[in-house]
Regions:
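Residue-level signal for secondary-structure boundary sites
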Residues: 10, 27, 99, 117-119
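Single-stranded nucleic-acid-binding OB-fold domains
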Residues: 8, 96-103
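Hydrophobic beta-strand-centered segment that forms part of the acyl-chain substrate-binding groove
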Residues: 50-94, 120-121, 125-127, 170
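Active-site helix/loop of acyl-thioester processing domains in fatty-acid/polyketide metabolism
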Residues: 2, 24-26, 38-66
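Catalytic strand-loop segment that frames the active site of acyl-thioester-processing enzymes
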Residues: 1-40, 165-166, 170
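Segments adjacent to and within acyl-thioester-processing domains across lipid
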Residues: 116-170
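Short aromatic-glycine-enriched beta-strand elements
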Residues: 14-17, 100-108
Length: 170
């Protein structure tokens, strides 16, 4: 996996970030999404794109806080399958408003070669907020968020079993 940031360049002269990910048949999403038709969820690619934009903001020292996607558009024109080799991400910064703590950006995701673009991410907007602005307690999350992991595991296994039964009867 590679990660690269640069300020003051890119499509709009404001900066860009690139990243890549080596796909493995052992990646966790392939065994459950979808049974008998494995594919990486499109939302996984979208989330990685948004994470890369947030990383650019932090690495550039321009915007800080908890990032939240505010708006955006995207188009999927392909899939990432278990035999895909590598995913390439690119984020181009359109502009950032430091006082308003907002980032505008676009980009794409390609599979196997940087030229094989399968997801287009049009104009996106991301805001950066403090814990107080989001009404998040100012203490470690373990003090206010304590999920019942055993129940979560039971529910996940039930879902997998029900999915297997469903596909066996198709």
């Amino acid at each position: 996996t590679d990660l690269y940031f640069e300020e003051g360049s890119g499509k709009y002269g404001k900066g860009y970030a690139t990243a890549s990910y080596d796909v493995s048949m052992e990646d966790p999403w392939f065994w459950c999404h979808f049974i008998g038709d494995p594919v990486m969820p499109g939302s996984q690619g979208l989330d990685a794109f948004l994470q890369l934009a947030g990383l650019w903001a932090g690495a550039s020292c321009e915007l800080f806080g908890r990032a939240r996607a505010l708006e955006g558009n995207y188009t999927y024109n392909g899939q990432i399958l278990p035999f895909s080799k590598k995913i390439f991400y690119r984020v181009d910064i359109i502009r950032f408003l430091k006082k308003k703590k907002v980032l505008f950006f676009e980009g794409h995701l390609a599979v196997d070669t940087p030229e094989n673009i399968i997801y287009q991410f049009g104009s996106n907007k991301m805001g950066f907020f403090t814990k107080a602005e989001l009404s998040i307690p100012d203490k470690p999350s373990g003090e206010y968020y304590q999920p019942d992991w055993e129940l979560a595991k039971i529910k996940a296994l039930e879902w997998i079993e029900n999915a297997r039964k469903y596909y066996e009867h198709k």
